Amino acid sequence: MGEKMAEEERFPNTTHEGFNVTLHTTLVVTTKLVLPTPGKPILPVQTGEQAQQEEQSSGMTIFFSLLVLAICIILVHLLIRYRLHFLPESVAVVSLGILMGAVIKIIEFKKLANWKEEEMFRPNMFFLLLLPPIIFESGYSLHKGNFFQNIGSITLFAVFGTAISAFVVGGGIYFLGQADVISKLNMTDSFAFGSLISAVDPVATIAIFNALHVDPVLNMLVFGESILNDAVSIVLTNTAEGLTRKNMSDVSGWQTFLQALDYFLKMFFGSAALGTLTGLISALVLKHIDLRKTPSLEFGMMIIFAYLPYGLAEGISLSETCVFAFLGLSIFSFPHKFEISFVIWCIVLVLFGRAVNIFPLSYLLNFFRDHKITPKMMFIMWFSGLRGAIPYALSLHLDLEPMEKRQLIGTTTIVIVLFTILLLGGSTMPLIRLMDIEDAKARRRNKKDVNLSKTEKMGNTVESEHLSELTEEEYEAHYIRRQDLKGFMWLDAKYLNPFFTRRLTQEDLHHGRIQMKTLTNKWYEEVRQGPSGSEDDEQELL
């Protein structure tokens, strides 16, 4: 059934201060990616000139990828350096990718060089190398209190909402194709495309939310949905691909649905269990092995646990901003098949599927929520359905025949991603101000104070004021004991958190004070003994 498939798991993680990994790794459901394996288990070893050419090509590919990432880092630095905070980093990097792709295309057209293989973005590179730290950072910077307080709403939007959107988009594409309005796709291919295009990635929108200080509940609903939504979208896409690879000609529609449901549940809950188990093990390891005095070892252990579940899922068959540069490059890198009617109808279906997802579920949730989701918040949530790196990489990974169908899906996905990032993402800030979503303090801010840089805010959690001002002991004394927590929140605060996290001892506090005093004295001596009147030193002090 799954012998010819290798699967990859998305492992989210989040920690307390001091890099202690806790139970809260479950806040991002891990997923697997079904990747086709080679037909032969062992590839023949190449020698001679062919091996040398392959080695040179691999070296150039690595060089080109690192060069793109380095240029992206420099671009983000320049945005911060010159305070271009009004421009989201994802939009800037996409524009950079488009520019680089155009330059490479001109060079190839002039026959000065041929970098077609080197500039080609491989989906395996994204899922195996770039995706783990992206998901890890999302979980690491997430405030667990706000997340678990809204876990029911977030799960409903991420799981059922994504499924609704996938069925609406996939069903619409299938029936429009049968009516000869657009190119025909079979049911499984339509559902696969509907699933991959339902993965939201509101990077620019979250940056705007943080800059304008919108309602924390709105911020958390959009951010939390985007984390879990990616997982559900990947699993749904894998489910459709798994059905495509099977011989479904003699199977009824009801049996197909049951097989798809069985495949989805196994992947979804199996992935979540594997990610949770890995997170708990990492929490216990970091609790009982104190690596804080050796930061290099601590950092290495964190990287290992971030990547570990991916390799484990592969074996048992079970930085996002820079990715946008490859998305821009792909405009000129891949052969495209552009069909205007297909693109327009897909955009309409994506927006309609998002509306069918957000508005009915929000009205349903308001019957059970104390903090109601207002109509303005619903509209912003619908408008925040940007697409990003996940749909793009999944579209490259789809194994569709004939090739024209695959090119059509890939081209349409790129257009939808660029449409949502540039148009919807670019108009989110004026829309929020027009609808008066931001708080009173944010309205008094000057436009120059608005900061859309994700990098500058890296590591800052989305948190509530009544939680951010409390230490662990104060939180336990004033919040847990007084508020009478129930359900999982009580279980987490009472048992799981103390068991899986390491509290600071008096000895730790003593060593911390000594280290801080030593560093302060050292810094003071360096400043006092430095050359007086140096403009460089004065600039550093400023």
UniProtKB/Swiss-Prot annotation:
Q: What is its main location?
A: Golgi
Location in the cell reads:
Golgi apparatus membrane; Golgi apparatus, trans-Golgi network membrane; Endosome, Multivesicular body membrane; Apical cell membrane
Q: In its keyword annotation, does this UniProt entry include Phosphoprotein?
A: yes
Modified positions (Phosphothreonine) are: T471
Q: Does the keyword Transmembrane helix apply?
A: yes
Q: Which reaction does it catalyse?
A: Na(+)(in) + H(+)(out) = Na(+)(out) + H(+)(in)
Topology in the membrane?
Answer: Multi-pass membrane protein
Q: Name one Pfam family in it.
A: Na_H_Exchanger
According to the lineage, what is the superkingdom? Eukaryota
Q: What is this protein called?
A: Sodium/hydrogen exchanger 8
For molecular function, the Gene Ontology terms on record are:
potassium:proton antiporter activity; sodium:proton antiporter activity
What do the Gene Ontology cellular component annotations say?
acrosomal vesicle; apical plasma membrane; Golgi membrane; multivesicular body membrane; trans-Golgi network membrane
Transmembrane residue ranges: 55-75, 79-99, 118-138, 151-171, 186-206, 256-276, 306-326, 349-369, 374-394, 412-432, 446-466
Phylogenetic placement of the source organism? Eukaryota, Metazoa, Chordata, Craniata, Vertebrata
Q: Which UniProt keywords apply?
A: Antiport, Cell membrane, Cytoplasmic vesicle, Differentiation, Endosome, Golgi apparatus, Ion transport, Membrane, Phosphoprotein, Sodium, Sodium transport, Spermatogenesis, Transmembrane, Transmembrane helix, Transport
Phosphoserine: residues carrying this PTM:
S532, S534
The family line of this record is: Belongs to the monovalent cation:proton antiporter 1 (CPA1) transporter (TC 2.A.36) family.
What is the annotated role of this protein in its UniProt record?
A: Na(+)/H(+) antiporter. Mediates the electoneutral exchange of intracellular H(+) ions for extracellular Na(+) in 1:1 stoichiometry. Acts as an Na(+)/H(+) exchanger in the trans-Golgi. Contributes to the regulation of pH regulation of Golgi apparatus, and consequently, in protein trafficking and endosomal morphology. In germ cells, plays a crucial role in acrosome biogenesis and sperm development, probably by playing a role in the fusion of the Golgi-derived vesicles that form the acrosomal cap. Can also be active at the cell surface of specialized cells.
Q: Name one GO biological process term.
A: regulation of intracellular pH
Q: Which organism is it from?
A: Macaca fascicularis
